[in-house]
Amino acid sequence: MVGMKVQHDGRLYSLDDERIVVYGGTLQYFRVPRNYWEDRLRKMKSHGLNTVETYIAWNWHEPQEGVFDFTGETHPQRDLIGFLELAQKLGLYVIIRPGPYICGEWKNGGIPDWLINSHPEILAKSPNGSFPRDVYYPPITYLHPTYLEYAMKWYEEVLPIIRDYLYSNGGSIISVTIDDEPSYWETIFQPFLTDYNEIIVRENGIWHSWLKENYSLGDLEERYGERFSDYTEIAPPKSFSEPLPKVLDWHHFKIWMINEYVRRLYEKIREYVDVPISLLDPYLLLAAWKEFYLYVTRHKLDIHLWTEFWYSFYRTFDFKEDKLGHLYFKTGIYRYYVSKLKTPPLSIETQASLANVIEKDEAELLYALLPALGIHNLNYYLYVGGENPRGYESHNGVTWDVYSPIGLDGRERQHVEPIKWIGEFLKSNIDFVDSQFKARVAFGMYEPYEALNLWGYKPESFEESVNLNEYLFGERGLLTLLAMSNVPFDVIDLEISTLEEMLQYEQIWVYSLDFMSREVQEKLIKYVEEGGNLVILPTLPYLDENMKPCTRLRDFLGVEVERAKARDNMRLIPYLSVDAEGIDRMVVRNVAREVKGGEAIAWIGDKVVGTIVRKGKGSAVILGFRLQYYSSYHDMHRKFVDKILQLQGVKREVEVSNRDIIAIPRIHYLVLVNPRDEEVAGKVKYRGVEFEIKMKGRGVLFIPVDVEINGVKLVYATATPIGGGNRRIKFRNHLSDTSEIAIRDGRIRGVKGGYVLQEKGERVYVIRHERETFEIEF
C-alpha cells in the first residue's frame, strides 16, 4: 500500500483514483475505555460509516513536561498507536486532529497546565491585564514566541507517529487538521476582551507592524479622523468610544494573527505530512472567511477549509423550518469559499450529540439538507459517548455521553436511522455529487456587517438596527422567508465577487446598513446596468467604509429612502401593516421608511415604502422595511416574495403546487423537503417531468430525475435510491406507503418488499410497499 495517495477533484476525495464520500463519526479514544474501542468502531462500520475522527489531546499525552505516552504505558486510553492500528485493521479511514488546541470541552482545550504555570506570559490579556486563571479555556496569545516554541515541540513528538500511519505510508490517516476553531478561544466575539499582550501592544509591537503593512499614515488619518506623525501614536482601541473603522481594523488585525498562527502550524505539519491538511471554521465567524481565503491564496497554503453545524448545545435538539434560513446562508457562504479554494466541502462537526434528546426526524432534516445544499462529506460529532478522565474534565464533569448515537454503554440511539440511510444514498449515488446545486438567486453579504451584529454594537449616529440575528439570519429572518418561499439561494461576498460572478445570478438580495464601501456600491450599480435584478432593504447606504458620505447607489437609482431611526428595544418596536397589489395588511416590524422615486409597489396608507426602478438592462427593488418570515393562513410574506420575483422576471426552476413542500434542484435529482411534522401533498414540475407527491411527516426525499442508476434509465422515482445491483434498485420512502416509478425502457420484473399497485401509463408504476425500503428488479 505504500505510495498510495489522497487526492481530490474539489468535490470528493479520491484514494488511489477511487472517489469516496467521507462519511464518518467522532470517537475520542482518550474518553472511551480501551476495551470498548473495537466494539464501538465495529458498530460505526455497521452504521455505514467509513471514517473515524478524533482529537489528540496534548495535555493527555504529555502530562509532565518532556514525559510522553503514546502507547498506553501510564493509562490504557493513551494508546494512540493501538487506536490507529485498530482502525486500520477494521478498514476505517482516520481524520486526526492533533491541536495544539482541541477545544472539545476538555481541560484547557488540551494546553498543558505545566506550560501555562511555568510560562504565564503566553496568556492573552484584556485591556485591564490578566484573566482569571480558572477560565475553562485560558486564551493564549497565538503568536507569542514561547507558546509557538512549545507547540512546535509538541508537533515534533506527535507528527512522526501520525506520519507512520498516513494513508500514503500504508496507514489509514487521510487528513490532519490544524488546531481547532482558532478564534482566540471564542473571545473574538467580544472585540475588547483580548489580546492586549505586551508583545502585541508595545511600541513597534505586532499591532504597529500590521498597521504599517496595511495602511499609510494618510490612510489612517482618513479612516480614524485624527492626525498622526508616527504609527506608534496609534494605540489599540479599548472601547466603542473609538472610531468604528479603528474597531473594525482591530477585529481584522486579530483575524490576521490567527491566519499567521495557522500558517506557522501548517508549515510544520507539512514537513511530516503529504495528505490533505485541513482547518475547521477559522474564527468561528462566517463572512470573515473572506480574510482566510485572501490570506491562504496570497501565501499559497494548501489548506482544506472545513465547517460544522450546531443547532443546540446542552438542550433538546431543535432543527425545524425556522432554522432553514441560517442553514441556507451558512452552506451558501461555505460553498462560495470552498469553490474558490477548490477543495472538497466537508462538515467535520455535524451535530449528533450534546443535546438532551435528538429526534430522528429533525436529525434527518439537518443531515439530509447538508448534502442537498452541496456538502456531501459528513462527519458526525460526537458519535461515541465516553467519560472524562479525572483532572481533564471541563464543561461536563465525568460525562462525555450527551445523547451520542452510540452511548457510553454501547446502546444505539434513534438518530442512527437517518445516518444509515443518508449514507447509503450518498455512497450508492456518487453521481449526485456531480449534479451540483446552482441557484438562480444569491444573497450578497457585506463582511463588516457580521462584526457589528456579533458585537451588538450600533454607532449612535446609525439609523438602521444591527440586529441581523433577528431580521436576517434568525428564525423569523429574511433568509428563512426566502428558504420557505422555495427560493434556494447561493451566498456571495460583495467585496471580492467580480461583476462576472454576480451576473451569474438573475437576482441578488442585499440587506443594507448605513454604510457600504464605495467599491461595493459601484459593483451593485454595474450589476443592475448589465441586466441584474437587485433587491435591497431596509435602507440604502449613505456612508462609505470610512464612515464618510457616499450615496453612489442611491444617486444611480434615483431613489430617496427616509432617514428614520430603527428602534433597538424589541418591546418598543411598532408592528405595521404593508399593502401591495394582491397583498392585504402584511405585518412588518420596526420602523418602515418612505421610499421616494421609482414605481410604487408597497405602501402603508398613503406612504410608499417599496418601489421598483428599471435601470440599464436590469432593475432594483428598494424596500424601506424589514421583510421577515411569518407563517399564517393568509401567507402574505411568501406571496410578497412571489410578487418580487414576478416583477423582476425571475422564474423558479421547480414548480410545486403546495408551497409547504420545499424543493432543491440538483440537475438530475430533486430534493423534496417537508420541514413540518404534518402531511403535505402536491404536484411537482421539474425538467419536463410532472408527478404527484405525498409526504406524511417531517423528512426528506432524494428524487432521481432523468438519470441512469444500476443500468436502469429512470424518468423519475418518488423514492430515494439507496443501492441495489445490476438492473436492481433498492429504494427508501418512509414518508408514504406508495411510490411512483417511471422508466424509459424495459419493465418491472419483480418487487421485493412491495408490489405493483397500478400501472398509470406507459412504464409508469405505482408501488405499494409494506416497509420503508423495497427493491425493484427491472
UniProtKB/Swiss-Prot annotation:
Task performed by this protein: Exo-type enzyme that specifically cleaves the non-reducing terminal glycosidic bond of chitooligosaccharides. Catalyzes the hydrolysis of GlcN-GlcNAc to glucosamine (GlcN) and N-acetylglucosamine (GlcNAc). Involved in chitin degradation. Can also hydrolyze chitosan and chitooligosaccharides of various chain lengths.
Protein name from the UniProt record: Exo-beta-D-glucosaminidase
pH dependence: Optimum pH is 6.
CDD domains with a match to the protein in the record: A4_beta-galactosidase_middle_domain
Mutagenesis / variant outcome for changing residue 308 to Q: Retains 15% of wild-type activity
Organism, scientific name: Pyrococcus horikoshii (strain ATCC 700860 / DSM 12428 / JCM 9974 / NBRC 100139 / OT-3)
Gene: glmA
UniProt pathway: Glycan degradation; chitin degradation
Transmembrane segments: none
Top-level taxonomy: Archaea, Methanobacteriati, Methanobacteriota, Thermococci, Thermococcales
